[in-house]
């Protein structure tokens, strides 16, 4: 695979909102260059050209793969296109960053894992874009938990109260058939963070949710938008840890968009974003002993849409490539994050607890 002694040459497949986010991050990192990009949408290609005019533009990613000498390919297309594009990319001698969710359902993810196994190359890094674990407050919270401050972790609560889904090219994100559903498309990030903190496998899911406020009057080509906009999801892990997600996508009037709370036998830790606050409260110290710290990325980190997390994700992946390390966010991580989301949607539909083994097959 790639030599660590030269600049990494990147090709981007899909240069909509997230693809351009990747470009902005990569042009700010030394030792790499975006040399080509591909997108079927002319407006998206024009937007990418304004960022990297020197890169070659393609309307067909297959032509880009055939014509360019690439080291890394980033797949940032709509979710339902991930699997088929991955099948083509993995046949090339390149490292791969594939955006979340890995696939729109578990079956797709399992197929992609098997395809990668069949095309394994020494030193190849295949990385899933679950970058929320790199947000500064979240990363600090994880480090504090790992240090043992909490004692034995028992409860993980994540709240995301935010704005509705943004408008995307051809409105692809208005339909669950394209996204996998809100709890896959959006919330795979949080199920990944939960699993990372719990250090255990999710075993069951119970959820309640609906589409109550957003996109109710949106109809495209005769089909009405069907993406839910609020939910509660409870996840039980094999080691006894419990996780809970509280999602509202009509809660713009919130001081923080994301709040993570981990409670253990010795302490409680909270991470608040975008306030960039981490709180640690030890049981022995009570309410008056809660310590609050401002935690933010260093000034050299490109903030972008995710508080610098996407930038740090690329830095971590490049370090893995150059040092011959394994991926920090694996296809298996991507699979589990999708499995919990898919289980949550099934739980809502059938009003019952769903075992992860049912979903994984």
Model-derived regions, located:
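C-terminal helix-rich "cap/oligomerization" subdomain common to oxidoreductases
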Residues: 1-4, 17, 31, 72-74, ...
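N-terminal Rossmann-like dinucleotide-binding module
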Residues: 1-52
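Residues forming the Rossmann-fold NAD(P)(H) cofactor-binding site
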Residues: 20, 83, 188
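Active-site loop of classical SDR/Rossmann-like NAD(P)-dependent oxidoreductases
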Residues: 21, 40, 302-314, 329, ...
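Conserved SAM-binding strand-loop segment of SAM-dependent methyltransferases
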Residues: 54-61
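Beta-strand-loop-alpha-helix segment that lines the small-molecule cofactor/substrate pocket
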Residues: 65-67, 72-79, 83-131, 148
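Predominantly a Rossmann-like dinucleotide-binding segment in NAD(P)-dependent oxidoreductases
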Residues: 122-124, 132-225, 351
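Contiguous beta-strand/loop segments that form the cofactor/metal-binding neighborhood of enzyme cores
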Residues: 191-277, 311-323, 361
């Amino acid at each position: 695979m790639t030599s660590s002694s030269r600049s990494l040459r990147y090709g981007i497949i899909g240069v909509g909102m997230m693809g351009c986010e990747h470009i902005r991050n990569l042009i700010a990192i030394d030792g790499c260059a975006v040399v080509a990009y591909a997108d079927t949408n002319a407006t998206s290609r024009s937007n990418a050209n304004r960022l990297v005019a020197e890169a070659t533009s393609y309307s067909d990613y297959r032509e880009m793969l055939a014509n360019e000498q690439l080291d890394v390919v980033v797949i940032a297309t709509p979710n339902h296109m991930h699997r088929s594009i991955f099948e083509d990319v993995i046949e090339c001698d390149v490292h791969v960053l594939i955006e979340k969710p890995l696939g729109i359902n578990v079956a797709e993810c399992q197929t992609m894992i098997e395809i990668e196994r069949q095309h394994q190359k020494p030193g190849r890094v295949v990385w899933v874009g679950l970058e929320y674990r790199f947000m500064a407050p979240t990363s600090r919270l994880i480090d504090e938990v790992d240090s043992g401050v909490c004692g034995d972790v028992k409860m993980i609560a994540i709240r995301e109260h935010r704005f509705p889904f943004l408008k995307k090219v051809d409105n692809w994100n208005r339909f669950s058939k394209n996204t996998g559903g809100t709890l896959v498309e959006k919330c795979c990030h949080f199920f990944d963070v939960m699993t990372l903190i719990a250090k255990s496998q999710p075993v069951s899911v119970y959820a309640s949710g609906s589409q109550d406020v957003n996109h109710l009057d949106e109809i495209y080509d005769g089909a009405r938008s069907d993406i839910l906009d609020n939910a509660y999801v409870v996840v039980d892990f094999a080691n006894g840890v419990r996780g809970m997600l509280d999602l509202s996508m009509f809660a713009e009037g919130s001081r923080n968009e994301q709040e993570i709370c981990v409670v253990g036998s010795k302490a409680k830790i909270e991470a608040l974003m975008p306030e960039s606050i981490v709180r640690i409260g030890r049981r022995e110290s009570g309410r008056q002993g809660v310590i609050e710290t401002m935690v933010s990325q260093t000034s050299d980190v490109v903030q972008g849409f995710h508080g610098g997390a996407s930038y740090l994700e690329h830095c971590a992946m490049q370090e893995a490539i150059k040092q011959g390390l394994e991926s920090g966010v694996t296809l298996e991580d991507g699979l589990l994050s999708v499995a919990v989301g898919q289980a949550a949607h099934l739980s809502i539909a059938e009003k019952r607890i769903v075992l992860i083994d049912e979903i994984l097959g």
